[in-house]
């Protein structure tokens, strides 16, 4: 649910699946001077899990931008814990003395209402429709399948806590295409027949609007399909032209592409002519000529068509390749397109993919685009993975704070777009091996979701899905069930390797209170309860941070929140003396949430925090 799970302040909301651990005798609590400690169950970690092999780069056919992984110099940390952080404030102490009658204390997050704001700071769920949910049994996911699973993403009901709580969906391409991934568009004004109809798409938008979900769709403007009528008409025209000179008044689409009689890098022959066309990604993906005024007019029509239907914005593919090797021209086009979209729909959200190092992609904010994906923290070589695998926790905080200055110098209104993995990267469950791999998988996911900006979550990451190597493996079917024949299950992309998942399917994880799935739900809930997390200006508290601790303060408007990440493998204590939040000293009453990845709970006593391995404390 988007704004879901609100409860009146002070009222305990007992979640489904929580259990009373011991029956309380009448008057027991009043007579017991010792009180009751909150007991907890945590999950057994996947002790022998082996790390999956990491894939080599992206296939040329992905069409999703440059293959080069950005080389980030800094790394950093954050963390989180399973959704069963049962004894938040009074009951966080763990076990109780022998003979004491106790009950499990409701998590503090259950008593805090959601505070979801309808703006551009959201939690987006990336959906590859092909592999998400199949409604008609043909093995291919479709729009009706996605509609049937919207309640999983967000049911729009504040009285429930059974959904993830994402309030945005990023749809990978849904336009007609000859390939499974659909990053080569044949028709920019329609829906691929394998996914459904335009009526299905409109039904999806209406269902999302009722739930408070903003839908952004992938818009591929760097290139089209070679089967796009624009390209086919231009090639036919050149064949008929013979030795004559092209005239765009005779064939307007000739100007939509880069045709030349000289073969340059990344160029391919137009069969039956002495002409060549540019296609930097793949021969069947001819590059569009974005200098063409006629094409820009067409692009303006395309954007307006989808915005008028109710789409909330666009994810722009491969923005650094619009004019390969020419950042200035790329930024100029982005600036033009941003202006076109905002004039049509002021609150439309735009996020661009510029797979570059931070100092290089930061300059694209000069275009005025809302967001750029934060590649610095993503993937196996990014800051999050490095910190979880042993780099100093402090580097997560230092880099988080530094980003503000780097991006802000180009656009003070930027909105960061942190993500951990996407359809071009190996899935994060393969980044970690050994007895702590499940803890690390959880913790790393929280590090991403607790960052400022609009956070993005790739479908299935909340289950710890596996997938590496070639692109098809990274886009495996959503793991609803271990039964591949179960209703809704997809067959997966053609040529996908056969492999087993590392962690349980959703069916099992829903029943496991300490699962990765429940952990992710809790992280998103904390994000939705505290708008400072997404919107706050970051202050890195270097004096409290180090190898195993990272402490961040975020301020939004007149409110502050503090995030403490502990990456150490043992339990450690952090002194919070002399620290204040919102004008008050920190105490047990400051707790807004705890995220643990094992049985041991985070405890705040006085002005000290005792934190087990891979845990997070949220204070306000």
Residue ranges: model-predicted function:
Residues 8-24:
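Bacterial N-terminal signal peptides that target proteins for export
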Residues 571-597:
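Beta-strand-rich binding/interaction modules
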Residues 226-227, 232-233, 237-262, 338-339, ...:
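Conserved alpha/beta catalytic core and glycan-binding cleft of carbohydrate-active enzymes
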Residues 602-620:
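C-terminal beta-strand-rich structural cap/linker in extracellular carbohydrate-active enzymes
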Residues 119, 344, 419-422, 434-573, ...:
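Loop/helix patches that line or flank the sugar-binding groove of alpha-linked glycan CAZymes
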Residues 37-72:
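Short, low-complexity, disordered segments immediately C-terminal to signal peptides
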Residues 32-35:
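C-terminal motif of bacterial Sec signal peptides marking the signal peptidase cleavage site
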Residues 37-43, 91, 99-297, 308, ...:
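Acidic/aromatic-lined carbohydrate-recognition and catalytic surfaces
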